[in-house]
């Protein structure tokens, strides 16, 4: 299916957007949850009187980024983290900085490759982050120079925007960036904030040994970030002409932090803050009351998580005047990833999300927010990732996040805790169920099932799909995110196997793929209980029934019902039992398929299939109401490095062939000890 240019610009899975011809693009005042909490105090006039009346240095002090002159703070930075960073920084020195060549930038348009250029830019950023951290701790000229070199390298980079995001090709047909009209994307905001934090920390030493560098940083930030932010209403992620996603808080938070640290005009900072809050309110307004993020946990860190970090910055800049900790949706959103935790580094993943933690999540900020809101389960969830002898943060999270973690002594001293692992979660806004037999334990099975729509951010065609974990480890899986290319956010997105409904554990009436867009939905017939709503009593079976006929291009009135039942009390054999029952009534006879996607060793034996990985095993049986159904097995030999990192060398699709205008099919999953 190919979207029209107009539909593509408004799609939740388009790469970036230039407003369709005739679209009204204007900034009109917005009133959402933030305005409901703060009222006119978040508007420019009030902020001009509060923030604008402070000195620029007072505002900088409030955001808690310590200068290199704060030797007491840097002497107390986590030694384990600094030791790791120093070792990597020593390896950096003496080698050339990565080349972000024009030919690499042009590959996005020429052959669809975006990863090679992105790796070069990321390498530059991470090397600079390491250099700044080591310079701050050691106060040695060698490292101050290394950091200055990195700052100059980024200042001389033609663009801070990525080729997959830059609008120069859409506007002017360029394969290179338009340096006259720079685009403000995620990475432009990241680099501006990174340079601003570096300037805040090392500025006193750069004044002595690198005069002119700080002025260069300010010039580039002005040209590439502040001026576009203040003058361009067509930037789609501002929310003035289309819906927003994780780009909104991610960019806004970085722009705001950079403005506070680099601008000497407090009144201008107040104006930027007012514009940023008006835009952020549009993002907060799209968050559902249950706190669910339709992009999943992987994007929570760089979406809702960025919102939390920005709100922390807002509270700091306003000296506590604008405090978001009491806004209900903020608290529910904070709890979302904790509710999706399967155990260890495994999570319920949807859309373009990974099933496993990548190992460099910035755990300090949910720990801090759990403390700010008094939510002990959130702090416990964060502490579950705080392993003895391991760094408090990773450079991959960026310099601002690294510095906040390094100087947070409460996070440094936090002791590992057991993850809360809620027993029952039901998020009606995205129709996601998570169920296990007992809270706080990975023992036994866990079920996650999903309804929703095929118009979600970073959408996969996954309506009616489910995953099963044993001992916290996914065995029936959601494939998740492969490496991004130009195809990923184009009209050809659903040619990618991982995003097709046929490669989710979902049915395929007549062998069909699910449809694309808001018209294709699942309907909840019977909803389970689970937090943040009422929770079923311990031992009571969970039941979710979905109507999936609307997920497929079927004749009106055709029905495909799927019912999920989780029985934590155990089957007759003494094991927990998950039952997935399909019933259909269609207008015509035909052949249908039911798919299961498995990770690990898949062993068929008669009408039983066993799946095993990392010492955990499940058995799968299926029948059509008359006799057992034996699946055929299709092996996907993975060649994508991101998928291999999660699943190993292969995935296996179990294909059950069924048929009839009317019929039923039941799948049973049990744990094997």
Q: Which role does the model predict for each range below?
A:
Residues 123-137, 149-153, 189-197:
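Non-membrane alpha-helical segments in proteins
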Residues 304-475, 647-649, 659:
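Carbohydrate-active enzyme catalytic cores, enriched for enzymes
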């Amino acid at each position: 299916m190919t979207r029209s240019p107009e539909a593509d610009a408004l799609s939740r899975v388009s790469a970036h957007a230039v407003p369709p011809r005739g679209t009204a693009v204007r900034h009109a005042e917005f009133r959402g949850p933030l305005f409901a909490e703060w009222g006119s105090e978040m508007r420019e006039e009030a902020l001009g009187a509060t923030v604008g009346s402070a000195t620029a240095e007072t505002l900088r002090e409030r955001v808690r980024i310590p200068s290199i002159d704060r030797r007491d703070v840097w002497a107390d930075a986590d030694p384990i983290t600094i030791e790791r960073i120093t070792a990597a920084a020593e390896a950096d020195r003496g080698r050339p900085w990565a080349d972000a060549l024009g030919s690499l930038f042009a590959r996005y348009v020429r052959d669809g490759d975006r990863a090679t250029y992105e790796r070069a830019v990321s390498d530059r950023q991470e090397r600079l982050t390491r250099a700044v951290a080591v310079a701050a701790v050691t106060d040695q000229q060698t490292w101050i120079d290394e950091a200055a070199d990195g700052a100059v390298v980024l200042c001389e980079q033609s663009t801070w925007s990525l080729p997959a995001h830059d609008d120069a090709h859409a506007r002017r047909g360029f394969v290179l960036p338009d340096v006259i009209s720079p685009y403000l994307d995620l990475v432009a905001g990241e680099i501006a904030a990174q340079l601003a934090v570096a300037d805040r920390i090392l500025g006193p030493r750069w004044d002595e040994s690198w005069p002119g560098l700080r002025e260069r940083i300010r010039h580039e930030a002005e040209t590439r970030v502040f001026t576009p932010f203040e003058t361009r209403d067509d930037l789609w992620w501002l929310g003035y002409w289309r819906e927003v996603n994780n780009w909104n808080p991610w960019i806004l938070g970085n722009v705001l932090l950079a403005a506070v640290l680099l601008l000497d005009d407090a009144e201008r900072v107040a104006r930027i803050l007012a514009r940023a809050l008006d835009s952020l309110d549009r993002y907060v307004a799209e968050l559902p009351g249950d706190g669910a993020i339709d992009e999943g946990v992987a994007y929570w860190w760089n979406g809702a998580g960025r919102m939390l970090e920005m709100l922390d910055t807002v509270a700091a800049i306003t000296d506590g005047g604008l405090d978001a900790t009491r806004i209900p949706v903020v608290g529910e959103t904070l709890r979302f990833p904790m509710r999706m935790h399967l155990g260890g580094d495994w999570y319920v993943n949807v859309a373009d999300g990974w099933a496993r933690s990548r190992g460099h999540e910035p755990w300090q900020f949910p720990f801090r927010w759990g403390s700010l809101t008094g939510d002990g389960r959130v702090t416990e969830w964060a502490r579950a990732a705080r392993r003895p002898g391991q760094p408090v943060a990773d450079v991959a999270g960026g310099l601002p996040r690294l510095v906040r973690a390094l100087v947070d002594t409460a996070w440094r001293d936090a002791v590992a805790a057991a993850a809360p692992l809620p027993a029952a979660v039901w998020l009606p806004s995205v129709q996601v169920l998570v169920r296990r037999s007992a809270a706080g334990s990975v023992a036994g099975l866990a079920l996650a099932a999903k309804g929703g729509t095929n118009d979600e951010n970073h959408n996969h065609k996954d309506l009616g799909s489910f995953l099963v974990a044993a001992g916290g480890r996914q065995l029936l899986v959601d494939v998740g995110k492969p490496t991004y290319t130009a195809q990923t956010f184009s009209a050809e997105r659903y040619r990618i196997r991982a995003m097709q409904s046929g490669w989710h554990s979902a049915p395929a009436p007549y062998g069909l793929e699910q449809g694309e867009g808001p018209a294709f939905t699942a309907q909840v017939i019977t909803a389970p209980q689970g937090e943040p709503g009422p929770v079923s009593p311990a031992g009571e079976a969970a039941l979710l029934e979905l109507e999936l006929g609307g997920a497929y291009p079927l004749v009106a009135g055709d029905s495909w019902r799927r019912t999920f039942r989780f029985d934590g009390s155990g089957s007759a054999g003494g094991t927990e039992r998950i039952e997935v029952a399909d019933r259909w009534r269609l207008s015509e006879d035909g052949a249908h398929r039911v798919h299961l996607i498995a990770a690990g060793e898949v062993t068929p034996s008669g009408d039983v299939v066993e799946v095993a990985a990392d010492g955990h095993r499940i058995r799968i049986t299926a029948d059509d109401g008359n006799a057992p159904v034996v699946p055929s097995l299709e092996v996907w030999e993975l060649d994508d490095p991101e998928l291999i990192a999660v699943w190993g060398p292969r995935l296996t699709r179990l294909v059950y062939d069924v048929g009839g205008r009317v019929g039923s099919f039941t799948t049973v999953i049990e744990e094997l000890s």
